[in-house]
Amino acid sequence: MVDAAFGRFDLGRAEDYRHFLLAQARVLLPLEARLATALHLPFRPRGHLLASDLASLDAVVPEPLTVEGLDGEEALLGALYVLEGSRLGGGMLARRVGPDLPRAFLGATHLRGEWRTLLAALDAAGETEAAQAAMVSGARFVFNLYAEAAGRPLAIA
């Protein structure tokens, strides 16, 4: 669903790639700021890489979407799962970026063991049905934000 919303961008074309990065920034930047102040799990932010790529394309960082309502450790873990999951696809998407376009953001793939560490943290935090439901809710919240940012609201329930 979100893949389809972002799949309409031709990453080989500078204008499409710029719009793709602008949509990413509307979600990633405020979400990383929220996670940095509220989550007790280390993660490697990519917002500075995204801002750098945008600057290279003469694009101004856009107005962020609100992440208000994303509360609680488990919901934030669900949100982080979506952000870190996007790193997995980012490395593949980087190959589709035009040769003269910046790709620091998409090229920031996981370091050895990072993904497994996150999955272990999710497993440890998800020992109850309530915790699992909160993680799923946080993930859905972020998927919906990304769909909105891409111009295709989805309302994933």
Language model features by range: what are they?
Residues M1-A157:
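Metal- and O2-centered redox machinery and metal/ROS homeostasis
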